[in-house]
Amino acid sequence: GVVPGLANTSRSRFLRGIAILYIEAIRGTPLIVQVMFLYFGLPLALGMRIPPDVAGVIAIGVNSGAYIAEIVRGAIQSIDKGQTEAGRSTGLTQAQTMLYIIWPQAFRRMIPPLTNQCIISLKDTSLLVVIGVGELTRQGQEIIAVNFRAFEVWLTVAIFYLAMTLSISAVLRYYERKLMIGRRAVPASPSDPQM
């Protein structure tokens, strides 16, 4: 998602066009359709077989990449243009300005939406059940087929998903706090009584 996100902020109309085409095509189609296309459609067109877990990983990765590209673009464009001008005026190239001035500031702003996207991607893995990937939802279905205890099994599956998403959220929140150290506003000093 970083490469198309950077391409979408590029001065090159060609790079921007490719990035926009990718982002809009992926965001404009449901993930389930992308999974089915990668597992059933593409292999027919190419005359090859793609294992279900490989197709699933590619589908989730490509889908996530489109959303991450927009997160990257938004974070970069949220940085004041004066930052770029300041970097350029000190003699930095466009790439150096992006790497040393814009990117560190933009990355801090990306953490909350990236956390959200990471959690969404984890939950989206449940859609891979349609192509036979043996993930958590599939395992739940198989257990229910044996013991017919749907309530307990689906409750357990939900608890597992909740535990995973809360863990991811906690880890990324920790890193967000680490990156924000030294970025908090300094409290105003008390006014001088002698003035």
Residue spans of the language-model regions?
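Transmembrane alpha-helices and adjacent helix-loop boundaries
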Residues: 1-195
